[in-house]
A protein has these predicted regions:
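Membrane-embedded alpha-helical bundles of polytopic integral membrane proteins
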Residues: 2-241
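Juxtamembrane interface at the ends
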Residues: 184-189, 254-262
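Interfacial loop-to-transmembrane junctions
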Residues: 259-282
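Membrane-embedded alpha-helical segments of transport systems
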Residues: 179, 211, 276-284
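Juxtamembrane boundary at the C-terminal end of a transmembrane helix
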Residues: 291-298
Length: 298
């Protein structure tokens, strides 16, 4: 056993998990990204089906996390309300009226449902979480559908007809992913000299990562808004807001995981963790980009 201590390849073993994890992350992206882009290209009910599946998977991850806490929100009710938001996004003309009716009915039904539970020690918290999770998941995904619209992309020989809705959704996806990537690598570059951003929620987050990630988001938005004919200063402003929204989304999910004493939300995406781990920034970014598109006349 003594000679094993001097094995020439032993110093390399600590790096093996990192290389393996990076390989898994890359493989997951190479497989998943074309699938996501294909559904974004198709739009309409095809994209609705994809987001519906994502909604179910994220709800299951939240269910698993909540089981590790003392809270018991009615996540099936959250799922139904979130799915209702998705359906309404497919009918934008009728959406305002139906939204008011749906939210009103949800409030009236959820209150007696949760408070009829015994014992009722956490009934008020469970009621609040039931509604909060519906908005946390369903509202951002419905914003993606509203941004995309139902005009399908078309291929014409050597060129493509890309609807504006595709560019808006790409702006959400690639804008937030560029922020995540920049924040991760730039934050790591300053490890040991960083300034913590929210140490009690996520010790690994730092101000250097936020600034670096936001700069990457700004550059991404400048490039991706060119087909939308937005002025450069609007693209810069959008990049800054997308960066801040991405960090808020990341910290929000980290807070949920900390409550559950969990490192990842799940294991659905090898190398990345769960669906929520990959989409936390997108949930907040989609709402911001949708509001922005309405303000500039999307």
């Amino acid at each position: 056993m003594q000679h094993a201590k001097h094995h020439p390849e032993e110093p390399e073993t600590p790096a093996m998990p990192r290389r393996s994890s990076l390989g898994l992350r890359t493989l997951t992206v190479c497989i998943g990204l074309p699938i996501v882009l294909a559904f974004v290209w198709l739009g309409g009910w095809a994209m609705f089906a994809l987001l519906g599946l994502v909604l179910v998977l994220m709800t299951l991850e939240l269910r698993s996390l909540m089981r590790r806490t003392s809270y018991r929100p009615s996540l099936w009710f959250s799922l139904l309300l979130a799915a209702f938001f998705l359906v309404l996004a497919m009918f934008p003309q009728q959406r305002p009226l139906l939204l008011e009716i749906g939210i009103g009915v949800a409030l009236l039904l959820s209150f007696p449902l949760l408070f009829s539970r015994l014992p009722a020690q956490h009934a008020l918290s469970d009621w609040g979480l039931t509604l909060a999770f519906a908005f946390y998941l369903g509202w951002p995904l419905s914003c993606l559908l509203l941004l995309r619209g139902d005009q399908a992309g078309q291929l014409h020989a050597i060129w493509a007809d890309i609807p504006r809705g595709v560019w808006w959704v790409l702006l959400v996806l690639l804008g937030t992913w560029s922020f995540d990537t920049g924040a991760f690598y730039i934050g790591r570059a300053f490890r040991g000299h960083q300034h913590p951003l929210a140490a009690q929620i996520s010790p690994g987050k730092n101000w250097e990562g936020l600034i670096g990630g936001t700069c990457c988001a700004v550059m991404g938005c400048i490039i991706l808004t060119r087909p939308l004919d937005l002025p450069w200063y609007q693209a810069v402003l959008l990049g800054i807001v997308v960066g801040c929204a991405g960090m808020c989304g990341d910290l929000s999910e980290s807070f949920i995981k900390r409550q559950a004493h969990a490192k990842d939300s799940g294991t659905m995406l090898p190398g990345h963790g769960g669906i929520l781990d990959r989409c936390d920034s997108i949930l907040f970014g989609s709402v911001i980009v949708y509001i922005f598109s309405m303000l500039v006349g999307g």
